[in-house]
Amino acid sequence: MPYFPGVEKVRFEGPSSDAPLAFRHYDANKIILGKPMREHLRMAACYWHTFVWPGADMFGVGTFKRPWQRSGDPMELAIGKADAAFEFFSKLGIDYYSFHDTDVAPEGSSLKEYRHHFAQMVDHLERHQEQTGIKLLWGTANCFSNPRFAAGAASNPDPEVFAYAAAQVFSAMNATLRLKGANYVLWGGREGYETLLNTDLKREREQLGRFMRMVVEHKHKIGFKGDLLIEPKPQEPTKHQYDYDSATVFGFLHEYGLEHEIKVNIEANHATLAGHSFHHEIATAVSLGIFGSIDANRGDPQNGWDTDQFPNSVEEMTLATYEILKAGGFKNGGYNFDSKVRRQSLDDVDLFHGHVAAMDVLALALERAAAMVQNDRLQQFKDQRYAGWQQPLGQAVLAGEFSLASLAEHAFAHELNPQAVSGRQEMLEGVVNRFIYT
């Protein structure tokens, strides 16, 4: 049976369209910088916010009455949920999706049941992928919702919890391989602490390092060719998360020799919580060589928690996409909508409205960012600003030809007296605005 009988396939109709559900800017096959929009953006809809979340929050029960969330046999409901999901993906015209293991299959009362249920659902998802052509951007394991993970998964003080998490990640990685997923994500949902009074930081970091090494070893053993991605987040649900931001993740990866094995999946709202701009987190990851993929959403600047709203700022997404294009674009990653409708958006059609508007935002951002890359005024200014480092003194310093003492002697001997030069921030902000708004 159709789950969205009142919704036709969403189509591109252009900026002048008054249709309630139509793309004004996302023209999937429009060529931008030599390839179609869809290949640049690699957009995905997530399973958890779209098909699992019931509209509950800490102050109230779920407000949604989704047909796939009614009471009944867990496996029958899981199959119905998958059918609804692929109907949604197909009508939306999105190319990818993402999931946690327990989003798609009931956990059951034992690992044996978990494994059996998950295997059945992977078969079902595979059939849907073959029928629709929709692909898996990434899979992951939910090692944070069950009470056994209250003190973390890999960082848990109980090695049996560590082993249980390993069983889930093993299963989810194998499923991602089977479904030809492009990436596998490791979000440390509760890998952190509530209080230092009962926490051994060194031990927990070593446990995380050991777990990540095991994941990397398994990736190579099974022949998974996609990227492994850690998703940084500074806090929530714990007081302090170990994967605080991109720079922190890089430090952790470098400590355990994994900086060439694991990249980052950057979420806009998590950057906000870390006190950074989304632009900063992407630029940092690119500069460190660990940029992988994006969770596209936004936070509310008045709220200190993860609101996971749909992205709606062309300006913010233009700067993000500019950095990604400058870095060569997505390799295996993409823009995954880790976004949810508001609790009062009760109708099933609201799921379409949220995604369609966000997809249009990304399409506009891509066009603006492409224009910035083609006439790269920002890079031209940076090249000029740092030009001194291409001169003999700068090159000699970078090549290690000076010690601190010999460089000081050079400064004394040449009576150096450099003067400050304008950074032209306001001019550059005007340049960016002209690309975005004209």
From Swiss-Prot:
It is found in: Cytoplasm. Belongs to the xylose isomerase family. Transmembrane segments: none annotated. GO terms for biological process: D-xylose metabolic process. It comes from the Bacteria. It catalyses: alpha-D-xylose = alpha-D-xylulofuranose. Its cofactor is Mg(2+). Its main location: cytoplasm. The keyword Nucleotide-binding does not apply. This is Xylose isomerase. Homotetramer. Its EC number is 5.3.1.5.
